[in-house]
Amino acid sequence: MRKIGKFIWAFLAVLAVFLCTGLATLGSVQSTGDSMTYVSGKTVMYKFSGGKKQLGSVYVNVGTIYEKIGDRVSIEIEYSSQSSPSTSGGTDLVPAYYMSNVYSSAGKNGLNYNWQEVTSGKSVSTEYLYFKASANLQLCEIVALDKDGEVIPMTPYTGSKDFTQEERAKTLDAQAAFNVEQVKAANTYFTFTQEEGLSMTAIHTLSAKSYQGCVYNLDGNFGVLSTLFMAGSVAIFGQSVFALRLAPFIASAIALVFLFLLCKDLFKSEKYAFFTALLFALGGVGLTVGRVGAPYAMVAAAILGSAYFTHRFFSKGISSKTPLKSGANLLFSGAFAAVAIAMETLSIVPVAAILVLFGFGVARIYKAEKLALEKLGVGKEEEGQELDETQKKAIAGVKAEYGYKKRVAFSFGGLAFVALTLFTFLAVGAICYKPLVLVYDNVGTHSMSFLSLIFTNALDSAKTSGLTAYTVENTASVFSWLLPLKTTYVYTAHTGTQYLAFGLSMNMGLAFLSLVALLFTTIRVAYGFVKKTADKAELRLRRIYFILLSAMAATMIAAGVKGMPTLLSATVFSAAFAAFVPLAAMSQESCACEKCKKIADVILYASAAVAAVFFALSLPVYYGFAVSHGYESVFIWTTFLRS
């Protein structure tokens, strides 16, 4: 059994820290429980337990709103003190409260699935409470507080004919979990961001019932498969912040593993693979993307998985002894590629770059066949040399062997990258047929075919359509990804004493080092071409250089084509960009002298130290925790130009 090297143990330690700190700070598992479907024009009525109470404020938690993203909805809270109250309404407690579906041009923070104080500043003595809204929506929870801020126990009013007793009880099943201090504090631990409000809305659409006059929404930035993946953990843990962020976070850890394995294969070194994974973990982008309840990290993990298995095929080829087993690399690669494209259609751009690597792998098989035949004398008969029977049999055997290898490569490649992609789209379309009809067609009169629904959803994810208030503000040229010129914020909040800015930015120190390493290796590779150096180390350096450069270019093109690119789409880019630092270090080992090896180690360890320092300085942004006013200067470490 092969001994596990120290750098593999070091990577496992980094992965363990990544998982433990991430899971511990991911978010609360508190859920608002079940929800009821509120129909516009009706009234939800409650009665305070124990008679009249001095009502101080009312908080509501509204989930999915069946209107277009960005539309405004009014919420009215009324009260009554009569012994025989009207079941259709009472006296307005305060003027109507307005909230927008997912986002508002007036505010950046998400409202859906978060607690909102809809009345305050007016204390009345009352016994009955009414809820009304101007749109159909999911009412998750409603809480009434007395003038001292204590929860007032209440029950559904039995005299009301609107909605059943069981339906109204669902809006009171998490009263004990309400904490007004948590609601008012600036935090991401208990709060859904706008991106996450959109994700929760899409998840709810998967199981939504059809109601007249409702508008149903999916996350327009991604295919419905990504919503299915996140729906699993929400089904297990409930409508909580932790549940929504769990799938993307696990995906970010998987991406870290695939990056390590890919670089171990690329560099032929556990040391360089470890430092690449470490720099990616400290880089900021991969960490934060995995902590946002949106599919970005899942797409990145699928692309890295596809790249890893394709490179295994490229480097190892098809084995003569176990051709089907080695060909399975292509099946795994195609499966991950299919998942990536089904989650985000423009993943087809990086997948196309991966297919180029597949083409080079096939070319290697042809080249190996040619060399094997030349060794047996093929071509010499043209010089007047006859081949004996033994040579002819050997040649026939080589042709049969490599013919089988080529058939395995092409059949597995075609099955993986074409058939699996088509199957994935069709399977997801069949599973999610009803929600696709709700979003894109008319339930009563079907006008779109099954394939049209799938195609429309795929086109949706190829453009920026699921906008939030942060989308435009976070937009920057893909070339700005080379340096942290602009921090991408997904949630900001401030109270009288605290300020919070949760976002992602390429680690400033690492970004500068990566850019220098990119320029250095570019000059180094160009110098090798000029000098016509062609030794084994030089060829490996060039191969790694062009693979990393292709990964960066492919993700930049995909984001640019989609429009409004942000760092949320730069996970694969940041991994490839950070890998140039180990590549620059490896280039110093080409002469194989002890001094050069020491220089390479200095580059690696010094770069890791610099990245760790800037990572520590940027913790409030990466992990999304608040700092006291007066300490906002910590955010200057996240960007060169502005924060």
Language model features with spans:
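Membrane-proximal lumenal/periplasmic loop motifs of glycosylation machinery
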Residues: K184-E195, S207-T227, G466-V472
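Membrane-interface transmembrane helices that cradle and orient dolichyl/undecaprenyl
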Residues: S306-L331, A340, V362-E369
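Short acidic/glycine- and proline-prone juxtamembrane loop motifs at membrane-interface regions
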Residues: P248, V285-M298, T345-L346
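Short helix- or helix-capping micro-motifs
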Residues: T276-A281, A337, I341
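Transmembrane-helix motifs of polytopic, lipid-linked glycan transferases
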Residues: F242, L246-F267, G305, A517-R524
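Transmembrane helical bundles and short interhelical boundary loops of multi-pass, membrane-embedded
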Residues: R2-M45, K184-N187, V356, V362-Y366, ...
